[in-house]
Amino acid sequence: MSITAAMVKEIREKTGAGMMDCKKALTEASGNMEKATEILREKGLAAVAKKAGRIASEGIVESYIHGGRIGVLVEVNSETDFVAKNQEFKDFVKDVAMHIAATNPQYVKRDEVDPLIIEKEKEFLTKQALNEGKPEKIVEKMVEGRIDKFLKEICLLDQPFVKNPDVTIGDLLTEKIAKIGENLSIRRFVRFEVGEGIEKKEENFAEEVAKQMAK
């Protein structure tokens, strides 16, 4: 099958890979677009793994305020000041800040979660499953699945991206590392919401942010 310029363009837009890399992947995949995308993704992930050990000490702190009701500060690091000034990097950090406003994660990644919190959640879920009358032999597997779901809800890198739920924030970060060519790291964030911790009328500001991001 002949590889057309339109095919190369489509794959390039989808993956952010170089033109020659796209052409090689399409040739290797005999023109199969999905297979070519997978080949590039695998190569991109390999490149990301090599970059992961490099120190990312530059970057930016981005702020996002939604209607004076929700505020977010997030620090995302890059290896160089040059990348920190790159518009694509800035847009990515802005998206992360808005995502945090919308979803209210508690941690950046799983290894930040206190093991005692996980243990307490396991105990609660085990009791809940047994009270539901579930057989003991399947309770452990059920609890494992529910703990995984719990961690996905509270850890930023595991959350489905508000703008595109087919990918997680972790996937998005990996894509940006492969595309930009530097190690990037979401280091920390803080989120404030007016009246947080005070009993008040229920208002879903997070849903408002998600709708705004979808525009």
UniProtKB/Swiss-Prot annotation:
Keyword terms: Cytoplasm, Elongation factor, Protein biosynthesis
Pfam families: EF_TS
The UniProt record lists the keyword Endoplasmic reticulum: no
Main location: cytoplasm
Cysteine disulfide links: none
Localization (cell): Cytoplasm
Keyword check for Protein biosynthesis: yes
Alphabetized CDD domains for the sequence: UBA_EF-Ts
GO MF assignments: translation elongation factor activity
Gene Ontology CC entries for this record: cytoplasm
Top-level division of the source organism's lineage: Bacteria
Region (Involved in Mg(2+) ion dislocation from EF-Tu): 80-83
Gene3D superfamilies: 1.10.286.20, DNA helicase RuvA subunit, C-terminal domain, Elongation factor Ts, dimerisation domain
Family: Belongs to the EF-Ts family.
Function, as annotated: Associates with the EF-Tu.GDP complex and induces the exchange of GDP to GTP. It remains bound to the aminoacyl-tRNA.EF-Tu.GTP complex up to the GTP hydrolysis stage on the ribosome.
Listed PANTHER family: ELONGATION FACTOR TS, ELONGATION FACTOR TS, MITOCHONDRIAL
Name of this chain's protein: Elongation factor Ts
Gene behind this protein: tsf
